[in-house]
Amino acid sequence: MNEGYDKIVEAETQNFRKLWFLDRYLANHDGYIAGGCFKDIFNGEPVKDIDIFFRDRSEFDRAKRYYERNEDFALAYDNDKTIAFRDLKSTSGIVIELIKKTFGEPIEMIETFDFSITKFAYYMEETPFDNEEDEDDDGTYMKNKIAYHKDFFEHLTMKRLVIDNKLDHPLNTLNRSWRYAGYGYGLCRESKEKLVKALQAVPEREIDFGKDFYDGVDW
């Protein structure tokens, strides 16, 4: 574990069967899934959209080409932040969003998310074989892994919005807290105080509640 991410837990996926359907969306590219869809999955709610992130632009470009050529998916929309495809085989009409505005490693990425209940990632990691006889030419294989905030499940059950890192874009965070409030989630006392202090430091000229607060990380 990276010492800089001491609040993040890493684990294998064999005990998380309800996540296995996500393998369909990790096939044939090197992206990873992160963000709000895990809240819906663990709450037993329908998953409407899945956010797929990438370590760099070239990974995004390869995934984009794959979905453009895949007849099981249809273009849903495209803007400067994401390109989205609808899964035509999904009974619930799942839309996958390929994020093209921000890039990084899975744990690095979820650490930038506002709330602990969004800090969850599902990804593939190159892993050495335990048995040398099973090794391929590289001596490694791809293993499914997850990474999540250590309090993810507790805060999800309590419907608590907890901010535990620096607020670089407090207006964005405020906007997202309103959205989550519509689903019954509320800021804890400490997070309210942190958000208020951060908002007080925002220059008045930058405050515009009618604008789109999205700044590339809206999960």
Language model region names:
Residues 1-219:
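Catalytic cores of the polymerase beta-like nucleotidyltransferase superfamily
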